[in-house]
Amino acid sequence: MVVREKQGGRMGKGKGKGKEKECDINCFGRSFFRVLLTLQSLERMKIPSSFNQCLQNQPTGMVSLVDRSGNKWSAELTSDSEGFFFVHGWKEFVRDNSIQCGQFLVFTYDKRSQFSVTVFEPSGIDKISTFSAHPSKNVIIKTESDEGGMVTAAITTEKMAPALKENNGITGKRTRDVDYLMEDRVVVFKKSSEANVCESSRRKRAGASAGKSKVTSTSHNSTRGSSCSSDEDNSSSKSPNPPFLMRFLSGEVSRRGRCVSKGQRQLTVISQRRPVTEAEKDHALQRAREFKSKNPFAVQIMMESYVYVGFFMNIPCEFVRECLPHTNKRITLWDPQGKAWEVNYVYYSDRSVGSFSGGWGKFAVGNNLEKFDVCVFELVQKDNIKVHIYRVVPEITPHKLRSDPK
């Protein structure tokens, strides 16, 4: 988009105000679009330089971002020598609308300090999930405990995800803190035309049959034999485990679903990895994006609430809707060494989203996952997911574990 340059020299005070008003009238209603291609654009988005002329009378500071349903988010508009940017608050808008790399956004400058935003999929179709997006707020949700029951999760942090309906009729509720969706990052969904796992799952759900088909589990050997194009580390399960880690993996140390109610301690993993660079993070993501398979798969970047504390991992929405069960159940994760890990898969029907809860912490700690590592979740068989790990730092440095007083 090219905006005509303002011509003419200095003008009188009266003419200046008239020109400013005329500029606003000409610019309000104009649009620009951005394709989100980098991780940085999910946290700090640059407005095209050709649109700067329309913002010459727009003061920097807080502005409103409005979705197609009329919901509003606040974000800070800043400027520097490179141009205008959306910064503080932009990350929350991205998270609440499940915006991912590869999607593109159309911004319309409605009026002073307000932009309307429409999100489109890479296919060019507007994103359906944005219709149900809402600004972040404090919520109470239900998540599944390690024992298979439901746990009441009291979320007290600001900037949280939209409320999720409770799953009534499940007992055994306990209170615990959840760091949920605080640092959700880019997800990528890929589905090969050869894959039929998702299609068969949808047909079975649409059939509304009275009985449930028997689940065929993937054997240890067959999962080992599946092709793997990642640089997964084969030493993670062989590395010596600290005594506290072994106690946690064996279940001796109280897990997150039961700590708060007993007045005990909540498990926290302390990373011993060296500091990492943005280039290393991008390189890990790039390697994961090069993964190819005939099976459907999703890419997820590990964040603090997934691997250091809380151990509650959000699964890419498209992967959940297209390929995973639309009910709570146990799912088997297969690590790069072929070891099986049972995890609780929690499905929220009102938004068609899912998460890994009980058991995910054991998988994350057992495989020494770190923040910014990238995992590819490949659906190799019904309720069986092979996890390919792309580490930011290939060398594994065992975690330290501690129980923080609550």
UniProtKB/Swiss-Prot annotation:
SMART domains per UniProt: B3
Checking Gene3D superfamilies in the record gives: DNA-binding pseudobarrel domain
Q: Where is the composition biased (Polar residues)?
A: 214-225
UniProt keyword list: DNA-binding, Nucleus, Repeat, Transcription, Transcription regulation
A GO molecular-function descriptor: DNA binding
Superkingdom of origin: Eukaryota
For this protein, the record's CDD domains field holds: B3_DNA (cd10017)
Which residues mediate DNA binding here? 30-123, 298-393
Keyword check for Mitochondrion, yes or no: no
Main localization, broad class: nucleus
Task: Tell me which Pfam families the record gives.
Answer: B3
Region (Disordered) location? 1-20, 199-245
| Compartments (UniProt record) | Nucleus
User: A cellular component term (GO) from this record?
Assistant: nucleus
The molecule here is called B3 domain-containing protein Os11g0197600
